[in-house]
Protein backbone atom coordinates (compact mmCIF):
# COMPACT_ATOMS: atom_id res chain seq x y z
CA UNK A 1 0.00 0.00 0.00
CA UNK A 2 1.24 3.49 -0.88
CA UNK A 3 2.27 5.27 2.32
CA UNK A 4 0.37 8.36 1.12
CA UNK A 5 -2.89 6.42 1.42
CA UNK A 6 -2.31 6.00 5.16
CA UNK A 7 -3.06 8.38 8.00
CA UNK A 8 -0.32 9.39 10.43
CA UNK A 9 -1.75 7.02 13.05
CA UNK A 10 -1.80 4.14 10.57
CA UNK A 11 1.86 4.70 9.74
CA UNK A 12 2.80 4.74 13.44
CA UNK A 13 0.89 1.50 14.05
CA UNK A 14 2.53 -0.25 11.11
CA UNK A 15 5.92 0.80 12.41
CA UNK A 16 4.97 -0.60 15.83
CA UNK A 17 3.93 -3.84 14.13
CA UNK A 18 7.34 -4.16 12.51
CA UNK A 19 9.10 -3.32 15.77
CA UNK A 20 7.17 -6.05 17.63
CA UNK A 21 8.32 -8.59 15.07
CA UNK A 22 11.90 -7.32 15.35
CA UNK A 23 11.67 -8.01 19.10
CA UNK A 24 10.59 -11.58 18.40
CA UNK A 25 6.93 -10.98 19.35
CA UNK A 26 4.45 -12.27 16.75
CA UNK A 27 1.59 -9.71 16.62
CA UNK A 28 -0.80 -12.31 15.15
CA UNK A 29 0.01 -15.56 17.01
CA UNK A 30 -1.56 -18.79 15.73
CA UNK A 31 -1.79 -20.66 19.04
CA UNK A 32 -5.02 -20.93 21.05
CA UNK A 33 -5.29 -18.50 23.93
CA UNK A 34 -7.19 -20.21 26.73
CA UNK A 35 -9.64 -18.04 28.69
CA UNK A 36 -11.72 -19.04 31.70
CA UNK A 37 -13.86 -15.99 32.45
CA UNK A 38 -15.82 -13.07 31.00
CA UNK A 39 -15.87 -9.51 32.30
CA UNK A 40 -19.52 -9.48 33.37
CA UNK A 41 -19.27 -12.85 35.12
CA UNK A 42 -16.15 -11.77 37.03
CA UNK A 43 -17.99 -8.73 38.38
CA UNK A 44 -21.18 -10.63 39.18
CA UNK A 45 -19.44 -13.47 41.00
CA UNK A 46 -16.86 -11.46 42.97
CA UNK A 47 -16.92 -11.79 46.77
CA UNK A 48 -14.65 -9.73 49.03
CA UNK A 49 -14.26 -12.45 51.64
CA UNK A 50 -13.05 -15.16 49.26
CA UNK A 51 -9.54 -16.08 48.12
CA UNK A 52 -8.53 -14.02 45.06
CA UNK A 53 -9.80 -15.77 41.94
CA UNK A 54 -7.27 -16.50 39.23
CA UNK A 55 -8.56 -15.61 35.77
CA UNK A 56 -7.45 -15.59 32.16
CA UNK A 57 -9.29 -13.11 29.93
CA UNK A 58 -8.87 -11.68 26.44
CA UNK A 59 -10.24 -8.72 24.52
CA UNK A 60 -9.58 -5.25 23.11
CA UNK A 61 -7.71 -2.59 25.04
CA UNK A 62 -10.17 0.31 24.95
CA UNK A 63 -8.47 2.82 27.27
CA UNK A 64 -5.11 3.21 29.01
CA UNK A 65 -3.85 5.39 31.88
CA UNK A 66 -0.08 5.14 32.38
CA UNK A 67 1.30 6.33 35.74
CA UNK A 68 4.97 5.47 35.60
CA UNK A 69 5.53 1.90 36.74
CA UNK A 70 1.79 1.20 37.12
CA UNK A 71 -1.11 1.56 34.71
CA UNK A 72 -4.83 0.93 34.35
CA UNK A 73 -6.47 -0.26 31.15
CA UNK A 74 -10.04 -1.06 30.21
CA UNK A 75 -10.41 -4.46 28.53
CA UNK A 76 -13.48 -5.17 26.38
CA UNK A 77 -14.49 -8.77 25.76
CA UNK A 78 -17.62 -10.17 24.10
CA UNK A 79 -19.79 -9.49 27.17
CA UNK A 80 -18.59 -6.13 28.44
CA UNK A 81 -15.66 -4.25 29.96
CA UNK A 82 -13.46 -4.65 33.02
CA UNK A 83 -10.59 -2.65 34.46
CA UNK A 84 -7.12 -4.22 34.53
CA UNK A 85 -4.30 -3.06 36.83
CA UNK A 86 -0.84 -3.54 35.31
CA UNK A 87 2.52 -2.93 36.99
CA UNK A 88 5.94 -3.13 35.42
CA UNK A 89 7.37 -5.58 37.94
CA UNK A 90 4.35 -7.91 37.84
CA UNK A 91 4.42 -8.52 34.08
CA UNK A 92 8.24 -8.25 33.94
CA UNK A 93 9.41 -10.20 37.01
CA UNK A 94 13.03 -10.50 35.80
CA UNK A 95 15.56 -7.84 34.78
CA UNK A 96 14.14 -7.40 31.26
CA UNK A 97 11.41 -4.74 31.47
CA UNK A 98 10.70 -4.49 27.72
CA UNK A 99 7.21 -6.03 27.94
CA UNK A 100 6.08 -3.06 30.06
CA UNK A 101 8.36 -0.18 29.02
CA UNK A 102 8.43 -0.88 25.28
CA UNK A 103 5.59 -3.22 24.33
CA UNK A 104 2.81 -2.12 26.68
CA UNK A 105 3.59 1.60 26.94
CA UNK A 106 4.74 2.33 23.38
CA UNK A 107 3.98 -0.40 20.85
CA UNK A 108 0.47 -1.36 21.94
CA UNK A 109 -2.41 0.88 20.87
CA UNK A 110 -6.06 1.26 21.75
CA UNK A 111 -8.03 -1.38 19.86
CA UNK A 112 -5.31 -4.04 20.10
CA UNK A 113 -6.32 -7.50 21.32
CA UNK A 114 -4.40 -8.74 24.35
CA UNK A 115 -4.62 -11.61 26.81
CA UNK A 116 -4.39 -11.03 30.56
CA UNK A 117 -3.67 -13.59 33.27
CA UNK A 118 -4.02 -12.48 36.88
CA UNK A 119 -6.32 -12.39 39.89
CA UNK A 120 -9.49 -10.47 40.73
CA UNK A 121 -9.51 -7.77 43.41
CA UNK A 122 -11.33 -4.61 44.43
CA UNK A 123 -9.45 -1.30 44.12
CA UNK A 124 -9.39 1.37 46.83
CA UNK A 125 -12.03 3.19 44.76
CA UNK A 126 -14.24 0.11 45.04
CA UNK A 127 -14.00 -1.06 41.41
CA UNK A 128 -13.75 -4.79 40.75
CA UNK A 129 -10.63 -5.24 38.61
CA UNK A 130 -8.01 -7.74 37.46
CA UNK A 131 -4.46 -7.50 38.77
CA UNK A 132 -2.36 -8.60 35.79
CA UNK A 133 0.50 -11.04 36.21
CA UNK A 134 1.04 -11.73 32.51
CA UNK A 135 0.24 -9.89 29.28
CA UNK A 136 0.12 -11.53 25.83
CA UNK A 137 -0.17 -9.73 22.49
CA UNK A 138 -2.96 -11.43 20.50
CA UNK A 139 -3.69 -9.12 17.55
CA UNK A 140 -2.33 -5.75 16.50
CA UNK A 141 -4.82 -3.26 15.04
CA UNK A 142 -3.26 -1.09 12.34
CA UNK A 143 -6.29 1.18 11.84
CA UNK A 144 -7.40 3.23 14.87
CA UNK A 145 -10.92 2.77 16.19
CA UNK A 146 -13.05 5.83 16.91
CA UNK A 147 -12.80 6.01 20.68
CA UNK A 148 -16.08 6.68 22.49
CA UNK A 149 -15.51 8.22 25.91
CA UNK A 150 -17.89 7.64 28.82
CA UNK A 151 -18.32 9.85 31.86
CA UNK A 152 -21.08 9.40 34.44
CA UNK A 153 -22.87 7.08 32.03
CA UNK A 154 -22.86 9.66 29.21
CA UNK A 155 -21.06 8.86 25.93
CA UNK A 156 -18.90 11.46 24.18
CA UNK A 157 -17.32 11.46 20.68
CA UNK A 158 -19.78 8.79 19.59
CA UNK A 159 -19.46 6.89 16.34
CA UNK A 160 -23.02 7.62 15.26
CA UNK A 161 -23.19 8.55 11.56
CA UNK A 162 -25.81 6.03 10.28
CA UNK A 163 -24.21 5.38 6.90
CA UNK A 164 -20.77 4.80 8.41
CA UNK A 165 -22.23 2.59 11.14
CA UNK A 166 -24.12 0.35 8.69
CA UNK A 167 -21.24 0.21 6.22
CA UNK A 168 -18.67 -0.55 8.93
CA UNK A 169 -20.81 -2.57 11.34
CA UNK A 170 -17.66 -4.21 12.74
CA UNK A 171 -16.57 -0.80 14.05
CA UNK A 172 -20.08 0.00 15.27
CA UNK A 173 -20.19 -3.21 17.33
CA UNK A 174 -16.70 -2.65 18.70
CA UNK A 175 -17.27 0.87 20.03
CA UNK A 176 -21.03 1.15 20.67
CA UNK A 177 -21.93 -1.32 23.40
CA UNK A 178 -25.69 -0.77 23.06
CA UNK A 179 -25.62 -1.93 19.41
CA UNK A 180 -24.36 -5.36 20.41
CA UNK A 181 -27.32 -5.63 22.83
CA UNK A 182 -29.75 -5.24 19.90
CA UNK A 183 -28.29 -8.28 18.15
CA UNK A 184 -28.14 -10.31 21.35
CA UNK A 185 -31.88 -9.65 21.69
CA UNK A 186 -32.38 -10.61 18.05
CA UNK A 187 -30.83 -13.99 18.81
CA UNK A 188 -33.18 -14.35 21.80
CA UNK A 189 -36.18 -13.63 19.54
CA UNK A 190 -35.18 -16.55 17.32
CA UNK A 191 -34.47 -18.98 20.15
CA UNK A 192 -37.73 -18.08 21.94
CA UNK A 193 -39.75 -18.63 18.76
CA UNK A 194 -38.07 -21.96 18.04
CA UNK A 195 -38.66 -23.04 21.63
CA UNK A 196 -42.37 -22.22 21.29
CA UNK A 197 -42.75 -24.20 18.05
CA UNK A 198 -40.66 -27.14 19.18
CA UNK A 199 -42.64 -27.41 22.43
CA UNK A 200 -45.76 -27.94 20.28
CA UNK A 201 -44.07 -30.73 18.35
CA UNK A 202 -43.64 -28.82 15.08
CA UNK A 203 -40.57 -29.55 12.94
CA UNK A 204 -38.09 -27.04 11.53
CA UNK A 205 -37.36 -27.69 7.84
CA UNK A 206 -35.46 -26.19 4.91
CA UNK A 207 -36.88 -25.54 1.45
CA UNK A 208 -35.21 -24.27 -1.76
CA UNK A 209 -33.97 -20.70 -2.04
CA UNK A 210 -33.41 -21.05 -5.79
CA UNK A 211 -36.81 -21.79 -7.32
CA UNK A 212 -38.01 -22.40 -10.86
CA UNK A 213 -41.21 -20.43 -10.14
CA UNK A 214 -41.33 -17.43 -7.81
CA UNK A 215 -44.49 -18.25 -5.86
CA UNK A 216 -46.12 -17.84 -2.49
CA UNK A 217 -46.36 -14.05 -2.45
CA UNK A 218 -47.12 -11.03 -4.61
CA UNK A 219 -43.65 -9.54 -5.14
CA UNK A 220 -41.03 -8.83 -7.80
CA UNK A 221 -38.28 -11.50 -7.68
CA UNK A 222 -34.55 -11.46 -8.32
CA UNK A 223 -33.76 -13.56 -11.40
CA UNK A 224 -30.60 -15.55 -12.08
CA UNK A 225 -29.54 -18.18 -14.63
CA UNK A 226 -28.48 -21.79 -14.07
CA UNK A 227 -25.78 -22.50 -16.64
CA UNK A 228 -25.80 -26.31 -16.46
CA UNK A 229 -29.58 -26.54 -16.93
CA UNK A 230 -29.73 -23.44 -19.15
CA UNK A 231 -32.81 -22.13 -17.37
CA UNK A 232 -33.84 -19.08 -15.36
CA UNK A 233 -34.14 -19.43 -11.59
CA UNK A 234 -35.69 -17.08 -9.05
CA UNK A 235 -34.48 -16.15 -5.60
CA UNK A 236 -37.18 -17.17 -3.14
CA UNK A 237 -39.83 -14.55 -2.37
CA UNK A 238 -41.64 -16.92 0.04
CA UNK A 239 -41.37 -20.52 1.22
CA UNK A 240 -45.14 -21.07 1.36
CA UNK A 241 -45.75 -23.43 -1.55
CA UNK A 242 -42.92 -25.80 -0.63
CA UNK A 243 -43.99 -25.94 3.01
CA UNK A 244 -47.54 -26.81 1.97
CA UNK A 245 -46.16 -29.65 -0.15
CA UNK A 246 -44.72 -31.05 3.10
CA UNK A 247 -48.17 -30.92 4.70
CA UNK A 248 -49.46 -32.88 1.69
CA UNK A 249 -46.64 -35.35 2.36
CA UNK A 250 -47.91 -36.06 5.86
CA UNK A 251 -46.16 -33.73 8.31
CA UNK A 252 -48.63 -32.21 10.77
CA UNK A 253 -46.68 -29.05 11.55
CA UNK A 254 -43.63 -27.56 9.81
CA UNK A 255 -41.88 -24.22 10.01
CA UNK A 256 -38.92 -22.51 8.38
CA UNK A 257 -36.89 -19.46 9.37
CA UNK A 258 -34.93 -18.33 6.34
CA UNK A 259 -33.96 -15.66 3.86
CA UNK A 260 -36.37 -14.27 1.28
CA UNK A 261 -35.47 -11.84 -1.51
CA UNK A 262 -37.63 -9.21 -3.19
CA UNK A 263 -36.36 -6.94 -5.95
CA UNK A 264 -38.14 -3.88 -4.66
CA UNK A 265 -37.42 -0.59 -2.91
CA UNK A 266 -35.45 0.01 0.26
CA UNK A 267 -36.70 2.16 3.11
CA UNK A 268 -36.92 2.22 6.91
CA UNK A 269 -38.89 -1.05 7.00
CA UNK A 270 -37.78 -2.85 3.81
CA UNK A 271 -34.52 -4.52 2.80
CA UNK A 272 -34.27 -6.56 -0.43
CA UNK A 273 -32.85 -9.49 1.56
CA UNK A 274 -34.83 -10.23 4.72
CA UNK A 275 -35.60 -13.04 7.14
CA UNK A 276 -39.06 -14.56 7.32
CA UNK A 277 -40.63 -17.32 9.38
CA UNK A 278 -43.48 -19.37 7.93
CA UNK A 279 -45.36 -22.11 9.80
CA UNK A 280 -48.10 -24.47 8.59
CA UNK A 281 -50.18 -26.68 10.88
CA UNK A 282 -52.67 -29.29 9.67
CA UNK A 283 -56.28 -29.49 10.92
CA UNK A 284 -56.27 -25.83 12.10
CA UNK A 285 -57.94 -22.64 10.85
CA UNK A 286 -57.20 -18.93 11.00
CA UNK A 287 -59.10 -18.48 14.27
CA UNK A 288 -56.79 -21.01 15.93
CA UNK A 289 -53.79 -19.32 14.30
CA UNK A 290 -54.74 -15.91 15.71
CA UNK A 291 -54.70 -17.28 19.24
CA UNK A 292 -51.49 -19.23 18.54
CA UNK A 293 -49.80 -16.09 17.15
CA UNK A 294 -50.70 -13.72 19.97
CA UNK A 295 -49.52 -16.21 22.60
CA UNK A 296 -46.27 -16.70 20.69
CA UNK A 297 -45.53 -12.97 20.45
CA UNK A 298 -46.40 -12.43 24.12
CA UNK A 299 -43.95 -15.20 25.07
CA UNK A 300 -41.18 -13.79 22.86
CA UNK A 301 -41.57 -10.32 24.34
CA UNK A 302 -41.39 -11.70 27.89
CA UNK A 303 -38.34 -13.83 27.07
CA UNK A 304 -36.50 -10.94 25.40
CA UNK A 305 -37.50 -8.00 27.61
CA UNK A 306 -38.90 -9.47 30.82
CA UNK A 307 -42.16 -7.57 30.20
CA UNK A 308 -44.92 -7.43 27.58
CA UNK A 309 -44.48 -3.67 27.11
CA UNK A 310 -41.95 -2.15 24.71
CA UNK A 311 -41.27 1.52 23.91
CA UNK A 312 -41.05 2.13 20.17
CA UNK A 313 -40.53 5.79 19.36
CA UNK A 314 -43.16 7.72 21.29
CA UNK A 315 -45.43 4.69 21.70
CA UNK A 316 -45.63 2.11 24.48
CA UNK A 317 -46.78 -1.10 22.79
CA UNK A 318 -48.27 -3.87 24.93
CA UNK A 319 -47.96 -7.37 23.49
CA UNK A 320 -50.03 -9.07 26.18
CA UNK A 321 -52.66 -11.33 24.59
CA UNK A 322 -55.45 -11.24 23.47
CA UNK A 323 -55.32 -8.69 20.63
CA UNK A 324 -58.16 -6.66 19.10
CA UNK A 325 -59.82 -8.05 15.93
CA UNK A 326 -61.26 -5.85 13.12
CA UNK A 327 -62.41 -6.92 9.64
CA UNK A 328 -60.71 -5.17 6.72
CA UNK A 329 -63.93 -3.73 5.26
CA UNK A 330 -65.03 -2.47 8.69
CA UNK A 331 -61.64 -0.79 9.06
CA UNK A 332 -61.97 0.93 5.67
CA UNK A 333 -65.51 2.02 6.48
CA UNK A 334 -64.37 3.43 9.83
CA UNK A 335 -61.46 5.43 8.39
CA UNK A 336 -62.89 6.56 5.03
CA UNK A 337 -66.66 6.47 5.48
CA UNK A 338 -67.05 4.17 2.45
CA UNK A 339 -68.57 0.69 2.75
CA UNK A 340 -66.99 -1.42 -0.02
CA UNK A 341 -69.14 -4.47 0.72
CA UNK A 342 -70.59 -5.81 -2.55
CA UNK A 343 -68.89 -3.20 -4.76
CA UNK A 344 -67.39 -4.22 -8.11
CA UNK A 345 -64.05 -3.03 -9.48
CA UNK A 346 -65.42 0.07 -11.20
CA UNK A 347 -67.31 1.19 -8.10
CA UNK A 348 -64.18 0.79 -5.96
CA UNK A 349 -62.19 2.71 -8.59
CA UNK A 350 -64.70 5.58 -8.23
CA UNK A 351 -64.21 5.51 -4.45
CA UNK A 352 -60.44 5.79 -4.96
CA UNK A 353 -60.95 8.80 -7.20
CA UNK A 354 -63.21 10.45 -4.59
CA UNK A 355 -60.45 9.83 -2.03
CA UNK A 356 -57.96 11.57 -4.38
CA UNK A 357 -55.78 8.48 -4.62
CA UNK A 358 -53.20 7.80 -7.31
CA UNK A 359 -54.28 4.64 -9.16
CA UNK A 360 -53.75 3.16 -12.61
CA UNK A 361 -55.42 0.74 -15.01
CA UNK A 362 -53.19 -2.20 -14.03
CA UNK A 363 -54.80 -2.34 -10.57
CA UNK A 364 -57.53 -4.91 -10.11
CA UNK A 365 -60.18 -4.96 -7.39
CA UNK A 366 -57.91 -6.52 -4.77
CA UNK A 367 -55.05 -4.11 -5.43
CA UNK A 368 -57.39 -1.12 -5.18
CA UNK A 369 -58.76 -2.28 -1.82
CA UNK A 370 -55.21 -2.90 -0.60
CA UNK A 371 -54.21 0.64 -1.62
CA UNK A 372 -57.17 2.16 0.25
CA UNK A 373 -56.35 0.21 3.41
CA UNK A 374 -52.65 1.04 3.17
CA UNK A 375 -53.23 4.76 2.74
CA UNK A 376 -56.04 5.39 5.21
CA UNK A 377 -56.08 2.57 7.77
CA UNK A 378 -52.83 0.68 8.28
CA UNK A 379 -50.90 3.47 9.98
CA UNK A 380 -53.58 3.97 12.63
CA UNK A 381 -53.06 0.60 14.33
CA UNK A 382 -50.37 1.13 16.96
CA UNK A 383 -51.36 -1.55 19.47
CA UNK A 384 -51.39 -5.15 18.13
CA UNK A 385 -54.57 -5.59 16.05
CA UNK A 386 -55.68 -8.46 13.82
CA UNK A 387 -57.18 -7.20 10.53
CA UNK A 388 -59.34 -10.08 9.29
CA UNK A 389 -61.51 -11.33 6.42
CA UNK A 390 -59.78 -9.95 3.32
CA UNK A 391 -61.59 -9.73 -0.04
CA UNK A 392 -61.11 -12.80 -2.25
CA UNK A 393 -59.24 -10.86 -4.96
CA UNK A 394 -56.45 -9.96 -2.51
CA UNK A 395 -55.73 -13.51 -1.37
CA UNK A 396 -55.17 -16.11 -4.13
CA UNK A 397 -53.87 -18.80 -1.73
CA UNK A 398 -56.56 -18.39 0.93
CA UNK A 399 -59.70 -20.40 1.65
CA UNK A 400 -63.07 -18.76 0.95
CA UNK A 401 -64.74 -17.44 4.11
CA UNK A 402 -67.12 -20.01 5.54
CA UNK A 403 -69.98 -17.48 5.79
CA UNK A 404 -69.26 -14.98 2.97
CA UNK A 405 -68.04 -16.16 -0.46
CA UNK A 406 -66.71 -12.67 -1.34
CA UNK A 407 -64.20 -12.81 1.53
CA UNK A 408 -61.36 -15.09 2.61
CA UNK A 409 -60.25 -16.46 5.97
CA UNK A 410 -57.14 -14.34 6.24
CA UNK A 411 -55.68 -12.03 8.84
CA UNK A 412 -52.75 -9.67 9.14
CA UNK A 413 -51.39 -8.48 12.46
CA UNK A 414 -50.79 -4.73 12.52
CA UNK A 415 -48.39 -3.25 15.08
CA UNK A 416 -47.06 0.30 15.27
CA UNK A 417 -48.76 1.15 11.98
CA UNK A 418 -47.18 -1.69 9.97
CA UNK A 419 -47.99 -5.27 9.01
CA UNK A 420 -46.13 -7.83 11.13
CA UNK A 421 -47.85 -11.16 10.37
CA UNK A 422 -49.88 -12.60 7.50
CA UNK A 423 -51.94 -15.78 7.95
CA UNK A 424 -54.72 -17.85 6.36
CA UNK A 425 -56.99 -20.77 6.54
CA UNK A 426 -55.09 -22.30 3.62
CA UNK A 427 -56.82 -23.01 0.32
CA UNK A 428 -56.73 -26.79 -0.22
CA UNK A 429 -59.28 -27.12 -3.06
CA UNK A 430 -57.09 -27.81 -6.15
CA UNK A 431 -59.79 -26.75 -8.63
CA UNK A 432 -60.39 -23.45 -6.84
CA UNK A 433 -56.63 -22.93 -6.53
CA UNK A 434 -56.08 -23.35 -10.27
CA UNK A 435 -58.88 -20.86 -11.00
CA UNK A 436 -57.30 -18.35 -8.61
CA UNK A 437 -53.92 -18.76 -10.31
CA UNK A 438 -55.60 -18.16 -13.68
CA UNK A 439 -57.15 -14.95 -12.34
CA UNK A 440 -53.67 -13.87 -11.25
CA UNK A 441 -52.37 -14.52 -14.77
CA UNK A 442 -55.03 -12.16 -16.14
CA UNK A 443 -53.75 -9.47 -13.77
CA UNK A 444 -50.23 -10.16 -15.01
CA UNK A 445 -51.39 -9.64 -18.59
CA UNK A 446 -52.84 -6.27 -17.51
CA UNK A 447 -49.37 -5.24 -16.36
CA UNK A 448 -49.33 -6.22 -12.67
CA UNK A 449 -45.74 -7.46 -12.30
CA UNK A 450 -46.45 -8.70 -8.77
CA UNK A 451 -49.19 -11.13 -9.82
CA UNK A 452 -48.49 -14.81 -9.13
CA UNK A 453 -47.44 -17.30 -11.80
CA UNK A 454 -49.28 -20.63 -12.07
CA UNK A 455 -47.35 -23.32 -10.19
CA UNK A 456 -48.73 -26.48 -11.81
CA UNK A 457 -46.72 -28.80 -9.58
CA UNK A 458 -48.24 -27.18 -6.50
CA UNK A 459 -51.73 -27.66 -7.94
CA UNK A 460 -50.81 -31.30 -8.62
CA UNK A 461 -49.75 -31.68 -4.98
CA UNK A 462 -53.14 -30.35 -3.84
CA UNK A 463 -54.85 -32.86 -6.14
CA UNK A 464 -53.36 -35.63 -4.01
CA UNK A 465 -55.10 -34.04 -1.03
CA UNK A 466 -54.02 -31.54 1.62
CA UNK A 467 -55.76 -31.59 5.02
CA UNK A 468 -57.38 -28.43 6.40
CA UNK A 469 -54.39 -26.25 7.28
CA UNK A 470 -53.60 -22.86 8.71
CA UNK A 471 -50.38 -21.02 7.91
CA UNK A 472 -48.70 -17.89 9.17
CA UNK A 473 -45.71 -15.82 8.05
CA UNK A 474 -43.92 -13.21 10.11
CA UNK A 475 -41.10 -10.83 9.19
CA UNK A 476 -38.33 -11.57 11.66
CA UNK A 477 -36.58 -8.26 11.05
CA UNK A 478 -39.72 -6.24 11.81
CA UNK A 479 -40.42 -8.42 14.85
CA UNK A 480 -36.89 -7.71 16.09
CA UNK A 481 -37.41 -3.98 15.46
CA UNK A 482 -40.44 -4.06 17.73
CA UNK A 483 -38.81 -6.18 20.43
CA UNK A 484 -35.79 -3.85 20.57
CA UNK A 485 -37.63 -0.55 20.12
CA UNK A 486 -35.92 0.32 16.84
CA UNK A 487 -37.51 2.51 14.17
CA UNK A 488 -35.47 1.35 11.14
CA UNK A 489 -34.80 -2.12 9.78
CA UNK A 490 -31.13 -1.21 9.22
CA UNK A 491 -30.62 -1.11 13.00
CA UNK A 492 -31.49 -4.81 13.37
CA UNK A 493 -29.56 -6.15 10.37
CA UNK A 494 -25.86 -6.78 10.84
CA UNK A 495 -25.14 -5.80 7.24
CA UNK A 496 -28.07 -3.99 5.56
CA UNK A 497 -27.98 -3.49 1.81
CA UNK A 498 -26.21 -0.22 0.99
CA UNK A 499 -25.69 1.87 -2.10
CA UNK A 500 -22.12 1.62 -3.45
CA UNK A 501 -19.63 3.62 -1.43
CA UNK A 502 -18.85 6.98 -3.01
CA UNK A 503 -15.36 7.08 -4.49
CA UNK A 504 -13.53 10.37 -4.93
CA UNK A 505 -12.97 10.89 -8.68
CA UNK A 506 -9.29 11.03 -9.64
CA UNK A 507 -7.53 11.70 -12.92
CA UNK A 508 -5.09 9.06 -14.13
CA UNK A 509 -1.33 9.64 -13.68
CA UNK A 510 -1.07 10.02 -17.48
CA UNK A 511 -3.19 13.21 -17.39
CA UNK A 512 -0.88 14.79 -14.84
CA UNK A 513 2.19 13.62 -16.76
CA UNK A 514 0.93 15.48 -19.86
CA UNK A 515 1.69 18.68 -17.90
CA UNK A 516 5.30 17.60 -17.43
CA UNK A 517 4.78 16.25 -13.90
CA UNK A 518 6.90 13.25 -12.89
CA UNK A 519 4.86 10.10 -12.17
CA UNK A 520 6.36 9.96 -8.65
CA UNK A 521 4.77 13.32 -7.84
CA UNK A 522 1.23 12.43 -8.96
CA UNK A 523 0.19 10.66 -5.70
CA UNK A 524 1.76 13.53 -3.72
CA UNK A 525 -0.32 16.09 -5.62
CA UNK A 526 -3.47 14.01 -5.11
CA UNK A 527 -2.66 13.58 -1.41
CA UNK A 528 -2.59 17.39 -1.21
CA UNK A 529 -6.20 17.41 -2.43
CA UNK A 530 -5.74 18.02 -6.15
CA UNK A 531 -7.35 14.81 -7.42
CA UNK A 532 -8.17 16.21 -10.86
CA UNK A 533 -5.88 18.20 -13.11
CA UNK A 534 -8.56 20.90 -13.21
CA UNK A 535 -8.29 21.27 -9.40
CA UNK A 536 -4.89 22.95 -9.89
CA UNK A 537 -6.07 25.43 -12.50
CA UNK A 538 -6.78 28.44 -10.25
CA UNK A 539 -4.24 27.60 -7.52
CA UNK A 540 -1.39 29.96 -6.67
CA UNK A 541 1.84 28.19 -7.72
CA UNK A 542 3.52 29.05 -4.42
CA UNK A 543 0.67 27.44 -2.45
CA UNK A 544 0.76 24.26 -4.55
CA UNK A 545 4.55 24.17 -4.20
CA UNK A 546 4.32 24.54 -0.43
CA UNK A 547 1.59 21.87 -0.17
CA UNK A 548 3.42 19.15 -2.08
CA UNK A 549 6.86 19.88 -0.65
CA UNK A 550 5.36 19.72 2.84
CA UNK A 551 3.96 16.25 2.12
CA UNK A 552 7.31 15.14 0.68
CA UNK A 553 9.00 16.17 3.93
CA UNK A 554 6.29 14.85 6.30
CA UNK A 555 6.20 11.37 4.77
CA UNK A 556 9.99 11.23 4.21
CA UNK A 557 9.53 10.41 0.52
CA UNK A 558 12.96 11.81 -0.38
CA UNK A 559 11.76 13.13 -3.75
CA UNK A 560 13.59 16.05 -5.37
CA UNK A 561 11.39 19.10 -4.82
CA UNK A 562 10.33 21.02 -7.95
CA UNK A 563 10.90 24.75 -8.11
CA UNK A 564 8.06 27.26 -7.88
CA UNK A 565 8.65 28.10 -11.55
CA UNK A 566 8.27 24.42 -12.51
CA UNK A 567 4.98 24.26 -10.60
CA UNK A 568 3.83 27.45 -12.34
CA UNK A 569 4.69 25.79 -15.66
CA UNK A 570 2.44 22.82 -14.83
CA UNK A 571 -0.48 25.12 -14.07
CA UNK A 572 0.10 27.17 -17.23
CA UNK A 573 -0.29 24.04 -19.38
CA UNK A 574 -3.78 23.27 -18.04
CA UNK A 575 -6.21 23.95 -20.90
CA UNK A 576 -9.33 25.98 -20.44
Curated annotation (Swiss-Prot):
Positions of transmembrane segments: none
Catalytic activity: tRNA(Lys) + L-lysine + ATP = L-lysyl-tRNA(Lys) + AMP + diphosphate
Keyword entries, A-Z: Aminoacyl-tRNA synthetase, ATP-binding, Cytoplasm, Ligase, Magnesium, Metal-binding, Nucleotide-binding, Protein biosynthesis
Top EC group: ligase
Record-listed Mg(2+) 2 binding positions: 419
Signal peptide: none
Subcellular localization(s) per the UniProt record: Cytoplasm
Record's keyword annotation contains Calcium: no
PROSITE patterns associated with the record: AA_TRNA_LIGASE_II
Binding site residues for Mg(2+) 1: 412, 419
Principal location: cytoplasm
UniProt record, GO biological process: lysyl-tRNA aminoacylation
Cofactor needs: Mg(2+)
GO cellular component: cytosol
UniProt entry tagged with the keyword Nucleotide-binding: yes
Similarity remark: Belongs to the class-II aminoacyl-tRNA synthetase family.
NCBIfam families tied to this protein: lysS_bact, PRK00484.1
PANTHER family attached to this UniProt entry: LYSINE--TRNA LIGASE, CHLOROPLASTIC_MITOCHONDRIAL, LYSYL-TRNA SYNTHETASE
Subunit structure and binding partners: Homodimer.
Protein name, UniProt field: Lysine--tRNA ligase
Organism, scientific name: Phocaeicola vulgatus (strain ATCC 8482 / DSM 1447 / JCM 5826 / CCUG 4940 / NBRC 14291 / NCTC 11154) (Bacteroides vulgatus)
Organism classification: Bacteria, Pseudomonadati, Bacteroidota, Bacteroidia, Bacteroidales
Amino acid sequence: MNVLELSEQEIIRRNSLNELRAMGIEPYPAAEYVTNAFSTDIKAEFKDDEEPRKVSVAGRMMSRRVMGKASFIELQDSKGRIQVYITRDDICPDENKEMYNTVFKRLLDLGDFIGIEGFVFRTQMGEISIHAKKLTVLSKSIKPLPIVKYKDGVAYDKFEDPELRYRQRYVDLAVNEEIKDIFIKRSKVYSSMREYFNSKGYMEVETPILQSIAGGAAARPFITHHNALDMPLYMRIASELYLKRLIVGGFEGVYEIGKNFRNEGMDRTHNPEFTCMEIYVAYKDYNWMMEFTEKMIEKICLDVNGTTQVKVGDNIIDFKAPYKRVTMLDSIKEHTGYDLTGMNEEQIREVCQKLNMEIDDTMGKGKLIDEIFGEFCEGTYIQPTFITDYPKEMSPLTKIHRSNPDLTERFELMVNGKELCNAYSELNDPIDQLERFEEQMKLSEKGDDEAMIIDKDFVRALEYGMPPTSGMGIGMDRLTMLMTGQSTIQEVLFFPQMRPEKITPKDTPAKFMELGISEDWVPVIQKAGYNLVSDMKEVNPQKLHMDICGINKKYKLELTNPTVDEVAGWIAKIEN
